[in-house]
């Protein structure tokens, strides 16, 4: 019978890989909780309308990348391509909003997009996501950036680049959009890729987000958003910059940074690395003050957040992440199988972590496995130990000592 293999674009995460993800999740919990964030878990499946209304009908995500299907009652459902929309939906549906109330959430989990699989880009991928609602002040933008920086630093990633821009607001964006349309109209339309030709009519800002080298070259002299900001947006962005300058965060202003989702306005940012190939962005986010209202919530609820791609971060992490075992119980004589199993259970009940050998093997093979799991100590059950009610304890450090003691005395 033929083997059943995993589908294209997904991965099996074995213990050595899962340990990296667990390390990132634990670090995120520790860092985010220190800023007052609480964990929120939202469904993987949502109504398709949620993403059409939030991400934008004309975005590549909605047009080409979502896993969407009808359920048995004909309702259109989508496996979430990102986390923010689901968190906003939960925020609105559960009426968490109150005047003056600031709410902070984080979440982890798998997301799904139908993309061409490559290093750092999978069809099922994992994100760490953080969002804050109810804070319009630039201090919130600065705190989000500093919290993201703290998380990345705490997982050992220092050589990353922060890029920032302001995308304006509904007051100043239309003037910029017109200036951009006028510029794009001056280009030879046929020289742009098919996607950008479509975007010129539906969402001109997305042209600046194109990854095609040819499109980037053609739009190199396009007008920039920072040159078209209204007074309030300029003041907001200048204050954000002043705050992160004071905090010592290193960054670069990138006037071409627009992000790939329609809901962003004002502050937008990306974190990039030059060490993971073509997919350089490892995190990104921004402010989305109009999204709560567009999903049925009250008007003018400010919000800002970010997401980190765990697959891409995992590619940058160095070192071993599987925790060392406290012990390994080596079964050398089959007669001691019951005694060794019970001894290992007592060790675990005392707060230690480790394994018990189920099959009698040579001492050499047992020690090899103890070294493989980085056990601190090896408890040996051979013929002599079985007959005398003892256990031999070997310190697995190089040149470690070995001693034989009574099993009954060991736990006293």
From Swiss-Prot:
Entry's EC annotation: 6.1.1.21
Catalytic function, reaction form: tRNA(His) + L-histidine + ATP = L-histidyl-tRNA(His) + AMP + diphosphate + H(+)
GO biological process, one term: histidyl-tRNA aminoacylation
Keywords: Aminoacyl-tRNA synthetase, ATP-binding, Cytoplasm, Ligase, Nucleotide-binding, Protein biosynthesis
Locations listed in the record: Cytoplasm
Protein name: Histidine--tRNA ligase
Gene Ontology MF terms in the entry: ATP binding; histidine-tRNA ligase activity
Gene name per UniProt: hisS
Database matches in InterPro entries: aa-tRNA-synth_II (IPR006195), aa-tRNA-synth_II/BPL/LPL (IPR045864), Anticodon-bd (IPR004154), Anticodon-bd_dom_sf (IPR036621), His-tRNA-ligase (IPR015807), HisRS-like_core (IPR041715), HisRS/HisZ (IPR004516)
Subunit architecture: Homodimer.
Group of enzyme by EC: ligase
Family note: Belongs to the class-II aminoacyl-tRNA synthetase family.
Domain of life: Bacteria
GO cellular component: cytoplasm
